[in-house]
């Protein structure tokens, strides 16, 4: 791991200065033209592609620093960049540029009997603070999304991704310069001292409007516990798949393997498979077999062990564990009622999927399961802003205030009311 890099003896003073610069940049961004924002975004994408060799070289240094550590494979995967991932990063920024500009959109409009004309209009949130670990791509995703929504952003990366993030951030600043937008609209905290995180959580003397953490459970828990400003976050992704007796088994096998094994280290990876007790004889064994063939370790409930006694028994802890690895817990449940009860007990309210052909089962699942994202006959790995057509996401929110699910450009706005009159006074 890198040693702490401190560029100022007074972290609070440094961070408050960053906050003031962000707040000053946010003002003109709030009414910047769509054309200027899109020009900046496309210039950022161009700069990332033009500097891909440098970004990869800096990423290699970050990876070398964690060599020999006990970091999980999922951590290394999130930290690792490649030509393909850099191309996807640039493509994601261009996709954000292609989105409709949410700022100024009239969400609703109505006339009052007294002649007042009222509009609810989208406005930027202001300054977003993003704290992340081992995900250098967040520098690009968060910077681009916040800019499109008219917000300034303060990015604080972990020491593990510092070099990669700095290289990407330089490209983002190049894009701002190309469009003559404020350079301080996207700032990367230049220190890895953890005191910088504490300063951000205190709001930087009123400069930060919202905090978004992207990282492990301990980081998110700290942010949710200590933040004095609103937080968009999820603690962990305990995602479930329920396979009903009415499910097409071939479809179920394909979806379950993809949901677990496509990328095991993302928050949308399935961690628990629930199988309808009425389908033990038809669905359970084929699902266990296809997971085993894919290289997945299975931890099963007592009912599962009766069918496959060679697998590892699941403990109570397994039902509450986000593995982020090629491991899945499997339980047999009493139909849709049992599935809903299990999910209500153990879910983190992130993403759940039902595989079924019975419309009544699907409708009940959609009605009674209270998670941010629900899918029918589709992989949980679609829990992603890009897959939702948002261009990218700044994170997944599982709370119920303001933003829920993938947080894209629309979720990074608030609103105000515009009321037009013709001399009315209130009696």
UniProtKB/Swiss-Prot annotation:
GO (cellular component) term, any one: cytoplasm
Catalytic reactions of this protein: L-glutamate 5-semialdehyde + phosphate + NADP(+) = L-glutamyl 5-phosphate + NADPH + H(+)
This enzyme's EC code(s): 1.2.1.41
Gene3D superfamilies reported in the protein's UniProt record: Aldehyde Dehydrogenase, Chain A, domain 1, Aldehyde Dehydrogenase, Chain A, domain 2
Pathway recorded for this protein: Amino-acid biosynthesis; L-proline biosynthesis; L-glutamate 5-semialdehyde from L-glutamate: step 2/2
Localization: Cytoplasm
Any matching Pfam family: Aldedh
Subcellular location, principal: cytoplasm
InterPro entries: Ald_DH/histidinol_DH, Ald_DH_C, Ald_DH_N, Aldehyde_DH_dom, G-glutamylP_reductase_CS, Glu-5-SA_DH, GPR_dom
Keywords: Amino-acid biosynthesis, Cytoplasm, NADP, Oxidoreductase, Proline biosynthesis
Disulphide connectivity of cysteines: none
Entry annotated with the keyword Oxidoreductase: yes
Enzyme class at the top of the EC tree: oxidoreductase
GO biological process: L-proline biosynthetic process
GO molecular function annotation: glutamate-5-semialdehyde dehydrogenase activity; NADP binding
UniProt function note: Catalyzes the NADPH-dependent reduction of L-glutamate 5-phosphate into L-glutamate 5-semialdehyde and phosphate. The product spontaneously undergoes cyclization to form 1-pyrroline-5-carboxylate.
Family: Belongs to the gamma-glutamyl phosphate reductase family.
Entry protein name: Gamma-glutamyl phosphate reductase
Record organism: Rhizobium etli (strain CIAT 652)
Gene name of the record: proA
